[in-house]
Amino acid sequence: MVIAELRNATKRFGPVTALAGIDLEIARGQLLALLGPNGAGKTTAVRLLLGLAKPDSGAARVFGRDPRERDARTRTGAMLQVGRVPETLRVCEHIQLFSSYYPKPLPFAETVRAAGLEGLERRLFGRLSSGQKQKVLFALAICGNPDILVLDEPTAGLDVDSRRGLWRHIRSFVARGGSVLLTTHYLEEADALADRIIVLSEGRIAAAGTSSEIRQRAAARKIRCITSLGDTEIVAMAERVSVRRDGVFTEIFASDSDRMVRGLFAQDPGMHDLEVTSAGLEEAFLAITEGNS
């Protein structure tokens, strides 16, 4: 069952096209991750699905409704990059206040437990660590007992332990049948959490699929070497080839690495420091986004 979707959604800000006719959908119990460099359109997609902005063309739907309608809003929880709450209120006061906005909120104790806030209920928000503050913002996103969570870079700036702790709570929400739209800069995060990944580049979908499918979409193998050949010469050797530079090294992503290596040696007998490895998700992501820029 589709919970939320964008259909041929386009959004412009003056001369800038933030989204150019994209399609995406989130099913019940699914975590969809949006990846992309700054300016790729991730936050714009989030704003459309939350009803904070309206597409110039196409449609945004949550539970089959306009996301600005009350029924859609009360079934949606959000944790945004710009989220701020008063630092002089206690954790329990924030949760109680936000819960009052919803018709069927989670019980207070369940919200605290689901966000990992046990023992912090009486603490002033301003006295919390960065990781604890993110847990509170996550609690405010789930306290209304939503069917879908929209999380815009929820672990940005957190240390590894805090990040992994929040991952556990997100996984628990999905395991209970919730749906999640997650934007992130952390490739490891998408790899660990997402059922499906969409890579955005300049407002368009550059790739979509599971983590393994994204790696295959970019290339099966990474060839790293020092060569005198230019990018244009390398790309012309085979189909589905991406190139990027790392200092004196050239990194080539190719689905047929054997053919590519033979071609490199044929055109540049002086090539050296050759290494062929499997492409990871981060490398696939870079190859896709740089290849579409």
Predicted regions, residues:
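ABC transporter nucleotide-binding domains
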Residues: 4, 11-182, 187-188, 192-201, ...
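Hydrophobic side chains in well-ordered alpha-helices
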Residues: 72, 210, 233-234, 260-264
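Solvent-exposed beta-strand sheet faces enriched in polar/charged residues
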Residues: 7, 63, 226, 275-277
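ABC-family P-loop ATPase nucleotide-binding domain
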Residues: 1-10, 291-293
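C-terminal coupling/interaction segments
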Residues: 255-293
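ABC transporter nucleotide-binding domain
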Residues: 167-255
